[in-house]
Curated annotation (Swiss-Prot):
Part of the 30S ribosomal subunit. Contacts protein S5. The interaction surface between S4 and S5 is involved in control of translational fidelity. One of its GO terms (cellular component) is small ribosomal subunit. One of the primary rRNA binding proteins, it binds directly to 16S rRNA where it nucleates assembly of the body of the 30S subunit. The keyword Oxidoreductase does not apply. This is Small ribosomal subunit protein uS4. Belongs to the universal ribosomal protein uS4 family. It comes from Histophilus somni (strain 2336) (Haemophilus somnus). One of its GO terms (molecular function) is rRNA binding. Residues 96-156 form the S4 RNA-binding domain. The gene is rpsD. InterPro entries: Ribosomal_uS4 (IPR022801), Ribosomal_uS4_bac-type (IPR005709), Ribosomal_uS4_CS (IPR018079), Ribosomal_uS4_N (IPR001912), S4_RNA-bd (IPR002942), S4_RNA-bd_sf (IPR036986).
């Protein structure tokens, strides 16, 4: 399946919640009818079956992190192999992706923009260029903007936007240096309460 390139707000309307696919300059409910699905019959809200609810939750999380279906399934398999709670393991793996860490540190306004920065070799990890968005960042890794990319206006603008967002406690960022440290693995309480990972586990456990 190809990566979705259509209107980002349509995806948020489909899931009925802000997926943080836009820059966050304005609240998403001022841009669109978030409670109404796209399409002619979007105002109708059919009652979902258990399977439907599980599928919608999986799609929502997959779209938040910009993951393709096959990738997402592989993350679930890895989460299931690890010790502990499978659902929480899944979220931790997704949060540890380099493109997500770049976004969380404020170097990009969206995860899609962060993915582009990584792919274009604008990001270094422990002093080495890494251009793989799915690269797993480890505790104490230093993630920074490459020296020759620090003049990019969009990175500076993103750092200004990041000042308006809640700062992740598991990261330590020096905005002036455009670098940060992955201090610890995030706990479930650190992450969005709007995600019900248990539904995803139920879906894949069938």
């Amino acid at each position: 399946m190809a990566r979705y390139l259509g209107p980002k707000l349509k995806l948020s309307r489909r899931e009925g919640t802000d997926l943080f696919l836009k820059s966050g300059v304005r609240a998403i409910d001022t841009k669109c009818k978030i409670d109404t699905a796209p399409g002619q019959h979007g105002a109708r809200k059919p009652r979902l079956s258990d399977y439907g609810s599980q599928l919608r939750e999986k799609q929502k999380v997959r779209r938040i992190y910009g993951i393709l279906e096959r990738q997402f399934r592989n993350y679930y398999k890895e989460a299931n192999r690890l010790k502990g709670n499978t659902g929480e393991n899944l979220l931790v793996l997704l949060e540890g992706r380099l493109d997500n860490v770049v976004y969380r540190m404020g170097f990009a306004a969206t995860r899609a923009e962060a993915r582009q920065l990584v792919s274009h070799k604008a990001i270094v990890v422990n002093g080495r260029v890494v251009n793989i968005p799915s690269f797993q960042v480890s505790v104490n890794d230093v993630v920074a903007v490459r020296e020759k990319s620090k003049k990019q206006a969009r990175i500076k603008a993103s750092l200004e936007l990041a000042e308006q967002r809640e700062k992740p406690t598991w990261l330590e960022v020096e905005a002036a240096k455009m670098e940060g440290v992955f201090k610890r693995v995030p706990e479930r309480s650190d992450l969005s309460a709007d995600i019900n990972e248990h539904l995803i586990v139920e879906l894949y456990s069938k």
